[in-house]
Amino acid sequence: VDAALTGPVRLAGCSAPSRIVFGPHVTNLGDGRRFSRRHVAYYERRARGGAGIVVTETASIHPGDQPYERAPLAEGNGAGWAAIAGACRPYGTLVLAGLGHAGLEGSSAWTRSALWGPSRVAEPATRELPMEMELTEIAEVVEGFARAAAGARDAGTDGVEIDIGVRSLLRQFHSGLTNHRTDDYGRDRTRVTREVITAVRHTFRSGILAVRVCCDELAPWAGITPESARGFVRELAPLVDLITVVRGGLYSSHAYRPDFHVARNFNTELCRRMREVAGATPVVLQGSVVDPADAQRALDEGVADLVEMTRAQIADPDLVRRSAAGRAPRPCVLCNQTCQVLDPRNPVVSCIGNPEAGAEPCEPSAGKPAAPGEVLVVGAGPAGLEAARTAAESGWSVRLAERSSRLGGEVARAGALVPHLLPLVDWLGAECARLGVRVALDTSMTRGEVTREMRSGTWVLVAEGSDPSPDPSPDPSPPPADGPHWMSAAAVLDGVPDGAVVTWDPVGGPLGVAVACRLAADGRDVTYVTPDDVVGSRLAATGDLSGAGERLQRAGVRRQLRSDLAGWDGTGIRCRDRYTGETRLVRCDVVVDCSPGRSRHELDVPGANRIGDCVAPRTVAEAIRDGRAAARHVLEREPDPTSTIWRTTWDCSTAR
């Protein structure tokens, strides 16, 4: 990658080590509403990896704004900002304090007070009506931004970023969807933003003043459009030092950081149009930019001056350094599975391919690494590949035995159904090759062979995976000879018998929807059956809930919701309504079961370290986390070949 992306850049009198930005996002790493030591370790790791600018998790500038339980509050967070800035400073990374107010798109669950909004417009998901802000509240917001900027200044940050993007009060003032006022703040919708910028600039004169601006709400009937955004970007650009162009609003918050179903670099043209009117103010491209080559192209073509690669740096904190050295970074597959954590359960930010994300050590390890030895990994799915890679990276001699003819396990086998995951297993395989892992394909291990390896002092990690589920029907009788053919989702790519198909999805994840759409695209008559009230119930967390329903609708897939499978019939399968108990026959010739598999126990040898689906069939995230944890356990302990105790004291199912 050319030095323009990974080389230094000047910004408002400051120098950043690269043009790559790590943008603000929900982490749930806080101690209540305060930045924690985990925040410090999280941001320090990206700075160490070469990030040019780090924008901290957006802090609410008013105590009445708490959009999620662990949302940082600017008031009283000076020590946290200071610790983050101090940790990033040795690497030259610029730290900007993210400041914002969620307005009517916040939550009253924790504050128990009315939400604030420009007008009485309900948030679409919660239907909660805000109070229409009076001049007193508007003045409080302006003062709140100034006071927060002063705190960031005193903490030693390099500047602030004001949120005028998705889920922000200032954007709500800009938009005709949410601003129906008839006073000066309605006639001049950017007035409050200008007042905030002026107050912040007056308070933090020496700092960088950046803004994150929504330039398309995807609601042209009344919302912000690219054309209207050009007007206020032209107006605001002379007042600020940096502009990050984003999209998404009241009815399209999912469009801000969408998953892999949306094309990468989707904001390219939008950013180009804003840069045309921004004058000399640098502009940042945001929007599923995960490939350094794409980022470089955006710079070369004049789309932007810097590029935000937030999810890509969650996946690989060393993205900048790897790119500068000509090495491929660990890919971000844009699954949104564990990095999008705006969730009332407060999951901590992480990454399916990098389980250390969000769990960076706050202190140097006090343990002494074990002397390098021999490791045998049985099974080359995601868990086995990650275990082999981690051990080999630490200098251990690693062998990897895989009974099939290819690496990647079920991900590789079902590649056409989950193509977004293939780059991750390909990268793991390439890293194993680079690190000298000795791979033996078409090699099955026996219990006796595993036992002999363990007795010789070799650490053995078993990642033998899972098998397809049995017949999903509770009917104990086998399917009638002339009835529907049952098959697993993984077998779909090997060919599906002729006729109508039922896709049974008891999980609500991405696989069931992908299978149904794939079969419908092949011209099959498909009915999607789920026990849930909606299609893909678990996809809300990734931002794909509405998208999944839309794809099924466009594909012509029928839906049978709130239903369990009740038994076989000669012409189809019986489905029972979960609420009424009513049974309905769905005629079909094939049932594709998208249930989790059954753990394999062929190598269930006492003392063997089992990881991945052979412990419990879960997702790629848990498989890779198991692989990393098991390998780290090996690296940190010195085995005693004369003892068997150490071989039985750890299992990934009880690891913390």
Please describe what each predicted stretch is.
Residues H254-F260, D305, V411-L417, D533-S537, ...:
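Short beta-alpha connecting loops at secondary-structure transitions
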Residues I197, P361-A370, E393, S405-R406, ...:
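Flanking helices and flexible, charged tails adjoining ferredoxin-like Fe-S electron-transfer domains
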Residues I573-D577:
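SH3/SH3-like beta-barrel fold
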Residues A51, T157, V240, A304, ...:
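Local beta-strand N-terminus motif with an aromatic residue
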Residues P369-E402, A440-R452, A463-P478, G483-A540, ...:
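Rossmann-like dinucleotide/flavin-binding elements
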